[in-house]
Design a protein with these regions (language model features):
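Gram-negative bacterial Sec-dependent N-terminal signal peptides
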Residues: 1-32
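Beta-strand-rich extracellular passenger or scaffold domains
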Residues: 32-258, 263-410
Length: 410
């Protein structure tokens, strides 16, 4: 079943058996084990530096023992081109401080019919999935005993379980494929400092990404994230960040609770109809920053920070929902903020310092009570009536492109 490949040639090994002292002058050691036959006996990878499971080879376990267990301090690389399948865990990893790289190649599978696909107990290193990891419980589970673990799910990769990926410790996650939670979350993160970039698809029955307990998570999304309850739930007590880039698509709202320091940043360009709101009164995002080229948010927005908590620092930002801002809105020079998208009517609370351009394109007659200051101009492009009742002291021009009336009572 297993062919071990050595750096020593056959003659050297034979002489070594006759003259053991010869091996003292020969530094080469066992290098790799190749699994080239299928087996229903659970396998333990612990003595060689590298293990390779050939294509079309299947390793199964019908009991609670993992189909393949990787442990000890000698293993540095495991490559699966075949099939690992267990009733218990498919692949168990417990390598402590030893750096380990696990590659699940395209077309390969790691699965469990009752437990977890890849169970990482203790490990530092990389899990690279180009194939399928599927399980009854967690597709991938990372225990709090691990550290410095990086998980890459490539464009051909699938990680699926009741919870797709569940991490109890800080990890780096790079997803270009699909991570799916069939009964709970696509990704569950409960502790540690996590960096997550998504260019693929993350979906869960409850939450796309669920951030809980003491996890601190930084997310950059230019892919798809969705859930039956929320796309993303920030429910930890740490300050989390969400960056939406070109290509981002959210199916469900983004909820913030438990922390007053969560933030949202927009880069690139996009259109989003999700709400970015707090779960309870007083919850929300400490800051929202537009750093991109063109973004439209048609959902509601809860901003709970102070100072310039809503900033339009570049490009064109359109808001078409109810924007509750405890602080101030700042529009910088050469940037623009549009309220309303021609069909929907936006509202904005808090102060508004406009050094660029503020555009009203409301879907109905509207009253705007926010005080406007700054050196920028105000434009109205819709055909409805706009009534300004704030204490306005902006010094820029007021330009009517459409509509019949502009009433200023402030």
């Amino acid at each position: 079943m297993s062919n071990k490949h050595f750096r020593l040639n056959k003659t050297t090994k034979t002489l070594g058996s006759l003259f053991p002292a010869l091996l003292l002058l020969t530094p080469a050691v066992a290098f790799a084990s190749t699994i080239d036959q299928s087996t229903s006996i659970p396998q333990n990878f612990s003595t060689d530096a590298e293990y390779v499971i050939n294509k079309d080879v299947t390793i199964t376990s019908s009991g609670n023992e993992a189909a393949v267990s990787v442990n000890g301090i000698d293993v540095s690389n495991v490559e699966n081109m075949g099939n690992i399948s267990g009733y218990g865990n498919g692949l168990d990893i417990s390598t402590g401080a030893q750096r380990l790289v696990v590659n699940n190649e395209e077309g390969a599978t790691i699965s469990s019919t009752s437990a977890t696909g890849v169970n990482i107990d203790t490990m530092q290193g990389d899990l690279i999935n180009k194939g399928n990891i599927t399980a009854a419980e967690n597709g991938v589970f990372v225990s709090k005993n691990s550290s410095a673990v990086s998980i890459s799910n490539t464009a051909t990769g699938l990680i699926k379980g009741k919870s797709g990926l569940n991490a109890e410790v800080g990890v780096a996650i790079h997803n270009a494929g699909t991570i799916k939670g069939t009964e709970v979350d696509g990704i569950t993160l409960s502790d540690g400092n996590i960096k997550l970039t998504n260019t693929g698809t993350v979906e869960g029955l409850q939450h796309g990404i669920n951030v809980t307990n003491t996890a601190k998570v930084d997310i950059i999304n230019s892919g798809s994230i969705g859930g039956g309850n929320t796309a993303i739930s920030f429910a930890s007590n740490k300050n989390n960040t969400l960056v939406l880039n070109t290509g981002s698509s959210l199916n469900g709202d983004v909820i913030s609770t438990g922390s007053t320091g969560n933030s949202l940043t927009l880069v690139g360009a996009g259109i989003e109809d999700s709400n970015f709101v707090g779960l309870n009164k007083g919850d929300g995002f400490a800051s929202v920053k537009m750093e991109g080229e063109s973004w439209t948010l048609t959902g509601d927005l809860d901003v709970i920070g102070s100072g310039d908590s809503l900033q339009v620092n570049s490009g064109d930002l359109t808001l078409a929902g109810t924007v509750s801002n405890s602080g101030n809105t700042l529009v910088t020079k050469d940037a623009s903020l549009q309220l309303g998208n021609g069909q929907k009517t936006a509202s904005l609370s808090g102060g508004l310092k406009n050094n660029g351009t503020v555009i009203f394109n409301q879907g109905n007659n509207s009253t705007f009570a926010t005080d406007m200051t700054g050196s920028g101009k105000v434009e109205k492009v819709d055909s409805h009536t706009l009534t300004l009742i704030g204490k306005n002291s902006y010094t820029g021009d007021t330009v009517l492109h459409g509509g019949t009336t502009l009433v200023a009572n402030g």
